Regions:
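Short, glycine/charged-enriched secondary-structure capping and boundary segments
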Residues: 30-33, 90, 123-124, 157-161
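Ligand-binding beta-strand-loop-alpha-helix segment within the catalytic cores
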Residues: 33-115
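Short beta-strand segments at enzyme active-site cores
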Residues: 14-26, 73-77, 109-110, 144-148
Length: 178
């Protein structure tokens, strides 16, 4: 994270950061089946809160790394600002909060989270889905994804025949969907 913060600190462009939950949120979410909504498990509500706390902790670590490089951040917490209609459908994204951060010279930072959901009670809202909505609204010149692998692959990166796709275009994405 410190290396990423160092790289970002050298650029004067405005940008928004969306990060995933990684190992902070995924284990509990999986153990308590949060992706499938509310259920009768009495421990699930505690698991929801614990997952939310852990992804917020990861967010704080990232924001602290940016702060050390003199970058101001504005955290937008999805579980407090967004609601979903199923796992890939954000009811409304609070662009005015992102805009206010950008207007005041801050970097808006948001992340994958457990949100309240109109269809199943709760939902895992991934950072990728948030990113899609932000791209539709802001229409950035480019989006950069940082991940555990050295790029986007044509198939599962653990497959020995997988190949890195050097530049991802709409045509590449169509090919990957097939």
């Amino acid at each position: 994270l410190n290396r990423i913060a160092s790289i970002l600190s050298k650029h004067s462009h405005q940008f928004i950061i969306v990060h995933g939950a990684g190992s902070f949120g995924h284990p509990i979410a999986k153990k308590f089946n949060l992706a499938n909504g509310l259920n009768k498990n009495p421990n699930q509500k505690k698991a929801i809160e614990e997952t939310r706390e852990q992804v917020l902790e990861l967010n704080q670590i990232l924001c602290n790394s940016l702060s050390k490089k003199k970058m101001l951040t504005k955290t937008i917490i999805p579980s407090k600002t967004m609601k979903t209609n199923g796992p890939k459908n954000i009811e409304s994204i609070p662009t005015e909060i992102f805009d206010k951060g950008l207007e005041t010279g801050k970097i808006p930072v948001t992340f994958g989270d457990v949100t309240d959901d109109n269809l199943q009670g709760i939902c895992i809202l991934s950072g990728d889905v948030i990113m899609e909505e932000l791209v539709k609204h802001y229409k950035p010149r480019m989006s950069i994804f940082v991940m555990d692998y050295p790029g986007v692959f044509d198939r599962n990166p653990t497959d020995k025949d997988s190949q890195i796709i050097p530049v991802v275009t709409l045509q590449t994405l169509k090919m990957l969907k097939e």
